[in-house]
Amino acid sequence: MVTHEWKEFEFLTSDLTKRFKLEHYSYKMIKGIDFYNLVLNFSQAFEHVTFKYENVKQIQIENDIAFVETEVGRYTGEYVFNSKNLFNPEINTQNSLLQQFEGWVIRTKKPSFNTEIGALMDFRLHQERGATFMYVLPTTAREALVEYTLFSEKVLDKEQYKVALENYIKDNLKIEAYEIIPKGYLF
């Protein structure tokens, strides 16, 4: 299921480049769909696991019991694990930053990447919108995941992610000719 792994990374700022090895560890890439299918297939083997495909309207907790209200009915349990942004989060002092991503897998015309070294955090970007960095995870000499990450109070327009990625690829990676393979917007 692991499609690639790295044991060495760079951390970059405008005045620092630090390369470090993970020693006994490695950073592994797993495609989301592969993980999803593995867990789904594994879970279906258990009699006490039921999958429901319904639109969730609300999630609440009352007296240590979790309630999930859907368009079809209401479900209860001790725990509810929610990995989706079902509702617009309220920005307040306890929840003041949103983590946002947009990542492109790019393919270059000529070898442009060292597959042994990833850039885990490249802070050589403007920081006016919040804590902003890129990471670059090369999987071949001609392909890499380039991902823009931002912690801020407001969600950017999709065009702003596009411009940031294009500028980074051109200005920082020094790549002029590339194609975007699959494209993903995550929030």
Model regions: which residues?
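Alpha-helical metal-binding/catalytic segments enriched in His/Glu/Asp
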Residues: V39
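Flavin (FAD/FMN) cofactor-binding core of flavoprotein oxidoreductases
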Residues: K174-F187
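Short acidic-glycine loop/turn motifs at beta-strand connectors
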Residues: L12-L16, T139-R142
